[in-house]
């Protein structure tokens, strides 16, 4: 193989790897995707009921966990029913949540759920990818007897 062919082959491999690798921005969910995930979860619950839906929502190989996006579901009293990132929090009250800066964002979620029924709350949280404390925004929507959330880190 001549040197020019070797360079061409290496260049082609580099180009192909760049095309097949997701862009860094694609590695993380967006606000629009968080809203869409919540809406899909609400529709799925309406279709099959919460008992079956929560199994799907907790399935790390399923359709409701995508990169760093996942859906959290709680009852109207704030008790978590679905929490795939931290299953040990299922059964715990979300409305008591406080971020690392002391912001009581759980109460903000409660106010949106009880008031307009949908909206966004911002707080600081440890990013599991970088290990750093980052701003996070969570979309909240109430449907039926449940409150649905999905959040994104502001990178």
Residue spans for each PLM region:
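N-terminal membrane-sensor/transducer module of prokaryotic signaling receptors
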Residues: 2-15, 20-155
